[in-house]
UniProtKB/Swiss-Prot annotation:
Subcellular location: Cytoplasm
Extent of the signal sequence: none
An example Gene Ontology biological process: cell wall mannoprotein biosynthetic process
Entry keyword DNA-binding: no
Name of one Pfam family that matches: GMPPB_C
Protein name, UniProt field: Mannose-1-phosphate guanyltransferase
Single GO molecular function: GTP binding
Keywords: Cell cycle, Cytoplasm, GTP-binding, Nucleotide-binding, Nucleotidyltransferase, Transferase
Amino acid sequence: MKALILVGGFGTRLRPLTLTMPKPLVEFGNKRMILHQIEALAAAGVTDIVLAVNYRPEIMEKYLAEYEKQFGINITISIESEPLGTAGPLKLAEDVLRKDDTPFFVLNSDVTCEYPFKELAAFHKAHGDEGTIVVTKVEEPSKYGVVVHKPNHPSRIDRFVEKPVQFVGNRINAGLYIFNPSVIDRVELRPTSIEQETFPAMVRDGQLHSFDLEGFWMDIGQPKDFLTGTCLYLSSLTKKGSKELAPTTLPYIHGGNVLIDPSAKIGKNCRIGPNVTIGPNVVVGDGVRLQRCVLLEGSKVKDHAWVKSTIVGWNSTVGKWARLENVTVLGDDVTIGDEIYVNGGSILPHKTIKANVDVPAIIM
């Protein structure tokens, strides 16, 4: 089988992290975002993966070569000379996606979930039509485009309703699809939207179905959702009884859902959790409080600091008795001085903060 991952462009929503690293290579749950998807695709029998990219493909090549060897698959980078939206990349990658008559997956690189690729492929084969989109149930469908089924048909899609005022359903597009190769005939090589142009045509022809996603789902393309997605991912590991998580019997673990790389160093009298990810070669000082946060590789949190609802970027330092909260994001190599308070916002790479940030701000 084959798959196309829509990587896209600059990752502006996840800045300042993406000023240093392309978004698919940012670590999520101590594993690069793209690796979560490649692992799941390979486990489902996918042998050919295309990445549709229009930003810094050269940085990705080294990592992708490693994944090719690791999983015994072929990975092709499809470089867009101009952004082609969500449908144009299918046409650009036609040579790979049409190399045989088997269906292919399409997925948004921002989406994290319990990827149901095997079940999705079996469901798609069973109904025999051209396409299937994965849908997930949400509590507030008025914020999204809602999928509405044909009367008396549990999966065939009748229409999409954008941000409905009245309740018409609670299933939304989850950004994962499977198509027969014939769908490429519906797409032109130009900037075009699969959601706004391709799907409505498939619905008119009665060729589009939906598949209900079980378990968690999140678009992690911006910091607050990255943190929420981390919580959901760690909770899913807990439900599975994953041995990757730090044992709750450790004296400094409070509330569980804590993932610590073996190379990280933890000081005395810390209180860590719930929902914390600590990456490789991170140093946590004595008496540190960590909650609902991500510490990326090489970062350092000094004694008695408080870090909550924060992403600490690579090689960044949080000073003694500092306090970070309210969706604070430190870029690469940022230094927060001792006893400094940061109340949200984004701090660009290589900055040193010597005064309190009382109101969320972008510090350049």
